[in-house]
Amino acid sequence: MLKSASQNFFRAYSSRIGRYAATASGKLAQSRLSNIPTPKALKKFLDEYIVGQEIGKKVLSVAVYNHYLRINDKQKKGELQRQRELMEREKIADDRDEPIFSGNSESKAGWRNLQRQFNLAGREVDEDLELSKSNVLVVGPSGSGKTLLATTLAKILNVPIAITDCTQLTQAGYIGEDVEVCIERLLVNAEFDVARAEKGIIVLDEIDKLAKPAASIGTKDVSGEGVQQSLLKIIEGHKVEITVKRPVKHDIDGQKNQTTTKKDEVFVVDTSNILFMIMGAFVGLDKHIVKRIEDMKKIQKAGESVESSNSKEVEKERAKKFRFSNTLEQVELDNGKKVCALDLTTPTDLVSFGLIPELIGRVPIITALQPLQRDDLFHILKEPKNALLDQYEYIFKQFGVRLCVTQKALKKVAQFALKEGTGARGLRGIMERLLLNVNYDCPGSNIAYVLIDEATVDSLQETEHSLASQVDVKYYSGDEKDSLIRDVSEEDKKLGVMLEKELGHSANIHTPTIPKRSLT
């Protein structure tokens, strides 16, 4: 009878503990590596939206992958520890309730077996090893795609992201925004879900504007080194208490008519698992790097340091030479290969630029983006998902107009943007000026087709910035498809063939060519 009772108890006990082990195993499985896109998958997704920047995309893909791998590992260890404690409490409770069986060899063997099963669920977890946090610093000229890289990664990972302009940050007590505003924005973008916000991405843009001045000029530095110091605790990973005005809806009449007010609410956010991406153009950093490398070569060659007076003269001449240049300086390596100077950025260079060593120490991954060339800008116009040309074609389609832009015209636009030195961000401005009056006149008219060719872009470059109304454009009515196809084919045969298939007309049909007309 005693043996039978012991067996019944053990079966019930085993079943209960088994459920805990299964629960632990299931929860651990939810955080497995398979849920994180691989670096190759991340880069492939970035390739769909971003042209060029191969090295930058690879560095960020690996950094993001390892960051969320670290989060998963931390979650596994936490869940494993909680389940282990739960099992221990259950065993103690059962031993207390049924002390007669506590020394039963069968129970002890069963417990050891269940404990082995539980430990098997976490066999890949090294509980003594803690993975360090690796934030990222991205250096690159304006318009090179820094912010787009971050927002695209957040999209594929389905995590909230908040972008903060560091030029607006000041020390606590001064007019401006406190550093905690970046966490507040992330929390808002996470719809006030603290757990989700704690796995998000914070982008600190224009971090170079926080560089501490080289020398004090008798004024209080409220947005430089002091702000950098304030950012240290947040970036490293601490629990931060913030007060946020959270919208609250009120039913005012019981008939689904609601009003919204804002109520102060306190949240505690742990920044340990938030990925910080620090970005900036760092204008002039390339010149500093070139100077550093030149000085090193001279020291190695002559065996003595460069005179400070000579260094100052070289720096002055270099500043004059590159003051109005949109390109970055290059460095020739010992093997004869030339690389962009920013590719050789070191933590020491960033400290010399004006960032404090403590901040640089919390951002171990540094990568540089290249200035975009004409071919890059050309491909950006038409190739990525959400390409600029696709957007404008879609807009014109909404009011019944087919927008046709030739390849030569796109190359001219790319060259124009390169000349202005505004990078990819400048492409939209040029397209807006190019299509301003076309967009104004076409809706509600009998115009069915618009052709933007090389001559159209040339006419834009010949006008003043504010006189984009003088751009030469070709217009076609609905029954002038053949004229459109013929004019397009003269400059872009591939587009002409595509239009012929799309519109169902032959370009060989001879119809009067519609004259060029300017929008005035």
Curated annotation (Swiss-Prot):
PANTHER family: ATP-DEPENDENT CLP PROTEASE ATP-BINDING SUBUNIT CLPX-LIKE, MITOCHONDRIAL, ATP-DEPENDENT CLP PROTEASE ATP-BINDING SUBUNIT CLPX-LIKE, MITOCHONDRIAL-RELATED. Residues 1-13 form a transit peptide. CDD domains: RecA-like_ClpX. Its main location: mitochondrion. ATP binds at G140, P141, S142, G143, S144, G145, K146, T147. SMART domains: AAA, ClpB_D2-small. The lineage of its organism: Eukaryota, Fungi, Dikarya, Ascomycota, Saccharomycotina. This is ATP-dependent clpX-like chaperone, mitochondrial. It is a peripheral membrane protein. The keyword Nuclease does not apply. It comes from Saccharomyces cerevisiae (strain ATCC 204508 / S288c). Disulfide bonds: none annotated. GO terms for molecular function: ATP binding; ATP hydrolysis activity. One of its GO terms (biological process) is protein refolding. Present with 10900 molecules/cell in log phase SD medium. Pfam families: AAA_2, ClpB_D2-small. Disruption phenotype: 5-fold reduced production of the first heme precursor 5-aminolevulinic acid (ALA) and 2-fold reduction in total heme. In combination with a disruption of HEM25 or an inactivated HEM1, abrogates mitochondrial respiration. Keywords: ATP-binding, Chaperone, Membrane, Mitochondrion, Mitochondrion inner membrane, Nucleotide-binding, Transit peptide. ATP-dependent unfoldase that stimulates the incorporation of the pyridoxal phosphate cofactor into 5-aminolevulinate synthase (HEM1), thereby activating 5-aminolevulinate (ALA) synthesis, the first step in heme biosynthesis. Up-regulates heme biosynthesis. The keyword Lyase does not apply. Homohexamer that forms a ring structure; this hexamerization requires ATP binding. Interacts with HEM1. It comes from the Eukaryota. It is found in: Mitochondrion inner membrane. InterPro entries: AAA+_ATPase, ATP-dep_Clp_protease_ClpX, ATPase_AAA_core, Clp_ATPase_C, P-loop_NTPase. Belongs to the ClpX chaperone family. GO terms for cellular component: mitochondrial inner membrane; mitochondrial matrix; mitochondrion.
